[in-house]
């Protein structure tokens, strides 16, 4: 203001922030206007005209009641989700087995509000999804971690040993894992469930791409332990809609009612998600094409000399680069945005449309000639401690 001395803007250090949050890095993924965006594992196929029209009609109907609060428990949406999952998994589910929220991250947060918190701990097997430790920190749940195998797969023996030794209240298992892409078999999950003293959260964000049966099949066997989380952001091509959900015994849904905020899912979100579910067969028809493209990309990268981690999702983790952040920048300079997930020597690329994958492979061929390194023996050990990952600052985010 004129005539007054400008007051310096306060920084984060000037605020009475919780001590355990000081020095933490927020979630971050570049959102850049580039020709090819392969960094956040979205479904590259846009919604069909029929789906868009259905969403518009559904939201218009919901808009007529915007002066009223939405269905607090999203009963119709949860019923639709139960029907979809019953058809997909063969497991008979009802509204009492489903809970929905604004993306699977809110689901994970609610789970830790209910089953984690001060004096409790959660364990994950790294490298894995970066939001697991971030949400643990936010709910003041002690974060524990154990390393994956040298190929980034889950060493079930080592995982069981870590759970047995450290007795966490919550166990996180991503299947398929992000950022490496491997799924965990039902037999492996059973061993973890048998060893775990508390809740086991199987994060199936990429479940529709997996070659393994869904962990939903085990909910009846482990009703007091198992929670399966999923999202409509990946295979469902509904990332902009922000809808996540969980499958569990009805008692877990009762626990969610204790911690959820009232009216947490807007009437617009509920209407749009229900419309998307009505077009599930059409939308999920792209999954087979994306899997075929993933395999084409993996084969081409291998032929160029890259080490490609076998994937069961809609992305591939590949290396080994002498300087992954520098290589990430070279991809960006070529108009291709991929992901530095914080694993030394490795980058991750989403499977896009055929023409997007072709552009990515052209850039990869140029980099393969100059930027590949011998096998990085220390990659796993280094990845066990999160670091500032080039431009992303996270491990294995969406």
Curated annotation (Swiss-Prot):
GO terms for molecular function: histidinol-phosphate transaminase activity; pyridoxal phosphate binding. This is Histidinol-phosphate aminotransferase. The gene is hisC. It catalyses: L-histidinol phosphate + 2-oxoglutarate = 3-(imidazol-4-yl)-2-oxopropyl phosphate + L-glutamate. The keyword Amino-acid biosynthesis applies. It comes from Mycobacterium avium (strain 104). InterPro entries: Aminotrans_II_pyridoxalP_BS (IPR001917), Aminotransferase_I/II_large (IPR004839), HisP_aminotrans (IPR005861), PyrdxlP-dep_Trfase (IPR015424), PyrdxlP-dep_Trfase_major (IPR015421), PyrdxlP-dep_Trfase_small (IPR015422). Its cofactor is pyridoxal 5'-phosphate. The keyword Amino-acid biosynthesis applies. The modification N6-(pyridoxal phosphate)lysine is found at residue 234. Homodimer. Residues 1-30 are annotated as: Disordered.
């Amino acid at each position: 203001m004129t005539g007054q001395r400008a007051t310096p803007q306060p920084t984060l250090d000037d605020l009475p922030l919780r001590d355990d949050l000081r020095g933490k890095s927020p979630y971050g993924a570049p959102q850049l206007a580039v020709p090819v965006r392969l960094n956040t594992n979205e479904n590259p196929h846009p919604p069909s005209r029929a789906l868009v029209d259905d969403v518009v009609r559904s939201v218009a109907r919901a808009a007529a009641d915007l002066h009223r609060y939405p269905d607090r428990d999203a009963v119709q949406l949860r019923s639709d989700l139960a029907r979809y999952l019953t058809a997909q998994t063969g497991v008979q589910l009802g509204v009492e087995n489903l809970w929905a929220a604004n993306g699977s991250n809110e689901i994970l947060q609610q789970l830790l509000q209910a089953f984690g918190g001060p004096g409790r701990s959660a364990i994950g097997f790294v490298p894995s999804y970066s939001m697991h430790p971030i949400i643990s920190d936010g709910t003041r749940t002690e974060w524990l971690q154990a390393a994956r195998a040298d190929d980034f797969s889950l060493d079930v023996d080592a995982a069981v040993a870590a759970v047995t030794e450290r007795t966490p209240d919550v166990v996180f298992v991503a299947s398929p894992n992000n950022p490496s892409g491997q799924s965990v078999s039902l037999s492996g999950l059973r061993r973890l469930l048998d060893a775990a003293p508390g809740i086991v959260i199987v994060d199936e964000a990429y479940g529709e791409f997996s070659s393994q049966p869904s962990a939903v099949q085990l909910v009846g066997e482990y009703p007091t332990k198992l929670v399966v989380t999923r999202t409509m952001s990946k295979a469902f091509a509904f990332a902009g809609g922000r809808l996540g959900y969980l499958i569990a015994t009805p008692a877990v849904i009762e626990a969610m009612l204790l911690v959820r905020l009232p009216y947490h899912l807007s009437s617009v979100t509920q209407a749009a998600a229900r419309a998307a579910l009505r077009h599930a067969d059409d939308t999920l028809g792209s999954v087979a094409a994306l899997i075929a493209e993933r395999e084409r990309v993996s084969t081409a990268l291998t032929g160029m000399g890259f080490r490609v981690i076998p994937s069961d999702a809609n992305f591939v983790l590949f290396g080994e680069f002498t300087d992954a952040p520098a290589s990430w920048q070279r991809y960006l300079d070529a108009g291709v945005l991929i992901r530095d997930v914080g694993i030394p020597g490795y980058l991750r690329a989403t499977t896009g449309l055929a023409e997007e994958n072709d552009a990515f492979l052209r850039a990869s061929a140029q980099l393969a000639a100059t930027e590949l390194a011998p096998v990085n023996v220390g990659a796993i050990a280094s990845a066990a401690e999160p670091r500032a990952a080039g431009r992303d600052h996270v491990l294995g985010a969406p």
